[in-house]
Amino acid sequence: MTDKVVHFEIPADDLDRARAFYQQAFGWTINSLPELDYNIVETTPIDETNVPTEPGAINGGMMRRQAPINSPVITIGVDDIDAALQRVEELGGKTEIPKQGVADMGFTAYFSDPEGNLVGLWASAQPG
């Protein structure tokens, strides 16, 4: 099975303005996580474990714009971030932000592909 796009992120210079825009323009629910300086963006209904209930639908996040995350980013779910970053680099990509923990939820990292696009990786702390 191939790895899937599981998340998106939208950077913003003014988080209040960006939250209001996406809530009003698209009806998205946006919840702040101040302890992580991050916002959860719900574009589709979720279950009790915060997983989208509609097949193929994804939710995302919003955070303050800071390099290298200057434009929207898709995030690919993988089982092993270290192995994924190794493959990326073997194929001409570059690690931009190394693996880091996100509370007790999982791990994230960012890489640029050979075309210069920034892409995120996510590995859940919970298997499956």
What are these regions (language model features)?
Residues I10, L33, L85-G128:
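Vicinal oxygen chelate
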